Amino acid sequence: MKAISYPLLIISFLLCHAAYSQTSSIDKVKFFEDTSIINATITTDMVKLFRQKERAGDEFPANFSATLPGNIVVNDPILLTVRGHYRRGYCYLPPLKVAFKYKKTSVMKPLGDLKLVSQCKTSETNEQYLFKEFLIYKIYNMITDMSFRVRLLDLELADSAGKKKSISEHAFLMEDIKNVAKRNDCKSWKTGKMDPRDVDRKQMTIVAIFEYMIGNTDWGVSVNHNTKLIVSKKDSMQLPYVVPYDFDFSGFVNTDYSVPDD
């Protein structure tokens, strides 16, 4: 008898039915407010993608197809970009960025460029890792609006040349930092290393306690690692706010490749 997926049960509980507006284009806020799972297919040259996965920045033309709530049919050309560091070399499928604004007529164009977080390997164990990381994002959404929203996909990766067998797995799309900033009347702030004393103390405390709670040491404001900064549009004296991401190295997820820092 197949073991019960407890993270998936919790996710199912959190994913209540939400009404999606009847529109022919995507609202980038409502897209992440809707919690239903999207059945999607990404078609690309899988042979080339796997062969060049360790080359960050390489781009691959692809196609994204799905049917969204409200009977919105999506069949758009997209551009995949290889990203990431550790997982790019370790995992069978590299971390990717999906450019929905690749074509002006794209239904998904308002979403811009989104990170696609996929399973590291094709196994039930790695599926659980993905569900756990997804759950961390959803929990943090409940704590603060200054957080990345995510949308779960039931994803099929298909080879455009038909030479490689399709891969079916779960994945999730992660909101762009510009959208996070906009929701909070802020703007994204690009900078290098930052002294933790020079960011908003209250928000920094929330981040630090949450990272401690999930057992994650793979982050740092001072080294510009797995954190983004947003700053108020209205108050020029307000210190920047920290927004964390990438939780696969946390003890909560407990991947077989994660090693805590000394």
Tell where the protein language model's regions lie, with residue ranges.
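Bacterial Sec-dependent N-terminal signal peptides
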Residues: 1-23
